[in-house]
């Protein structure tokens, strides 16, 4: 009897220990379930990440074996003596920046962005222009930031300063009037010098004589995406003379008499300069509605105010050096509108390109993401943004392309843009 009691006691203890073990095991299992799920999710997302990245391996690794400049940013973790391969062949081109000494930080930000996204793979020259001598700090900092050669030039006074034939009384009155109207840069004398210089003198600088193409860069801009190609090469191979990324409406208060001067020029000029059958004149003169939500901006002249935003432009210097462009500029310049009003280089370049070039000599670089305050542009194709590692959202309010103030749809219809819009009733 005593033996039975001992046996039952041992069985009870064993059952209790077993139940306790089961409870502990169940508790541990329940605690581990979220962790196991997390491991499963981590494994899934890791696998998907590898699938996406491997899809773009060629794009991501296409520049791993580039030969890079020793004295500057290499953008490469490997020692230079381990790099192998052949440099990308460069075109006869330069990156061009009109900049002042005090804008150094903004210049470096723009340079870093463009070097990261494009020039680290080509090492194009950087050319800097200023109306006063560059200081040593500016030269040293920009030289260190560039992957290619840097060069600096002082703009001659006769190319920059206000011409002597401008009536000073009328000029001062114009400054005061525009300042009272709160027109952007309406009271600035130096801004007018800059617009006139960029319209008719930048391409005459001796430092640019050796080059065929230029890429205009301004301080404090950003390039959102890796460049999928060399735009200079695209320009040369496809016989393009002018390239842009953003097009929008101009402020009419800055150019009230510009179109009148253009019309006078058209009446007086030789017809050989202009071919209305093949040019993009409709881009700057057409007022037709495009779609239900994209109308037109009111204008008091025959100019619809569309222009290419020239803070990003890639151009053929030989077009600007041509007699037909110089004749056009000098005629406009003789009217004094750069000073009595506030004509910008953007509408001047845009009207000139639309009149004097064939529409298929102008290219819209729609794969290039770009930001100049307050507007930007971002490629609309999702997989293109992935492939080019873009840091932008095509649906962001800052993306001007589908904004009502954008002229991109006008370019699609009246330039060398979208075929379906040209034939849409």
Swiss-Prot record:
EC number(s) from the headed UniProt entry: 2.4.1.-
Task: Report TM segments.
Answer: 14-33
**Residue ranges of region Stem region?**
34-89
- Keyword Heme, does the record have it? no
Matching SUPFAM superfamilies: Nucleotide-diphospho-sugar transferases
Biological processes annotated in GO: cell wall mannoprotein biosynthetic process; protein N-linked glycosylation; protein O-linked glycosylation
Keyword annotations for this protein, in alphabetical order, are: Glycoprotein, Glycosyltransferase, Golgi apparatus, Membrane, Signal-anchor, Transferase, Transmembrane, Transmembrane helix
The record places the following residue ranges in the Lumenal compartment, namely 34-425
Q: How does it sit in the membrane?
A: Single-pass type II membrane protein
Q: What class of enzyme is it?
A: transferase
Could you name the active-site residues?
313
Compartments in which it is found: Golgi apparatus membrane
Positions bearing carbohydrate:
65, 81, 92, 167
Q: In which pathway does it act?
A: Protein modification; protein glycosylation
Q: Name one GO molecular function term.
A: mannosyltransferase activity
InterPro entries with a match to the protein in the record = Glyco_trans_15, Nucleotide-diphossugar_trans
Say what the protein does. Answer: Involved in N-linked glycosylation. Transfers an alpha-D-mannosyl residue from GDP-mannose into lipid-linked oligosaccharide, forming an alpha-(1->2)-D-mannosyl-D-mannose linkage.
Q: What is the protein's name according to its record?
A: Probable mannosyltransferase KTR2
From which source organism is this entry? Saccharomyces cerevisiae (strain ATCC 204508 / S288c)
Organism phylogeny: Eukaryota, Fungi, Dikarya, Ascomycota, Saccharomycotina
């Amino acid at each position: 009897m005593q033996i039975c009691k001992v046996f039952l006691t041992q069985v009870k203890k064993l059952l209790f220990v077993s139940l306790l073990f089961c409870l502990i095991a169940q508790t541990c299992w329940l605690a581990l379930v979220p962790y196991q799920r997390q491991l499963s999710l981590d494994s899934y997302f890791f696998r998907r990440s590898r699938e996406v990245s491997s899809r773009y391996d060629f794009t991501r690794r296409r520049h791993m074996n580039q030969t890079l400049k020793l004295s500057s940013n290499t953008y490469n973790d490997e020692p230079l003596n381990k790099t192998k391969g052949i440099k990308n062949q460069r075109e006869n081109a330069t990156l061009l920046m009109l900049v002042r000494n005090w804008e150094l930080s903004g210049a470096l930000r723009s340079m870093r962005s463009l070097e990261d996204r494009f020039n680290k793979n080509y090492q194009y020259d950087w050319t800097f222009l200023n109306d006063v001598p560059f200081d040593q700090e500016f030269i040293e900092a920009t030289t260190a930031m560039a992957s290619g050669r840097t060069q600096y030039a002082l703009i001659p006074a006769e190319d920059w300063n206000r011409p002597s034939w401008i009536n000073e009384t009328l000029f001062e009155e114009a400054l005061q009037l525009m300042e009272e109207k709160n027109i952007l840069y309406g009271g600035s004398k130096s801004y007018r010098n800059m617009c006139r210089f960029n319209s008719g003198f930048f391409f005459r600088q001796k430092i640019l004589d050796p080059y065929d193409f230029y890429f205009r860069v301004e301080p404090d801009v950003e390039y959102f995406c890796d460049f999928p190609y060399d735009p200079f090469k695209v320009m040369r191979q496809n016989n393009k003379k002018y390239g842009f990324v953003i097009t929008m409406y101009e402020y009419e208060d800055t150019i009230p008499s510009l179109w009148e001067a253009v019309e006078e020029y058209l009446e007086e000029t030789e017809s050989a300069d202009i071919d209305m059958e093949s040019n993009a004149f409709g881009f700057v003169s057409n007022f037709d509605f495009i779609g239900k939500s994209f109308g037109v901006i009111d204008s008091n002249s025959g100019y619809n105010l569309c222009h290419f935003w020239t803070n990003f432009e890639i151009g053929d210097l030989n077009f600007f050096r041509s007699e037909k462009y110089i004749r056009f500029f000098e005629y406009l310049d003789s009217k004094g509108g750069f000073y009595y009003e506030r004509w910008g280089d953007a509408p001047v370049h845009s009207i000139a390109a639309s009149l004097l070039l064939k529409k298929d000599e102008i290219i819209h670089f729609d794969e290039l993401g770009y930001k100049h305050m307050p507007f930007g542009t971002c490629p609309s194709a999702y997989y293109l943004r992935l492939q080019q590692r873009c840091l932008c959202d095509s649906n962001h309010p800052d993306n001007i392309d589908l904004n009502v103030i954008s002229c991109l749809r006008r370019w699609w219809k009246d330039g060398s843009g979208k075929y379906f819009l040209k034939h849409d009733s």
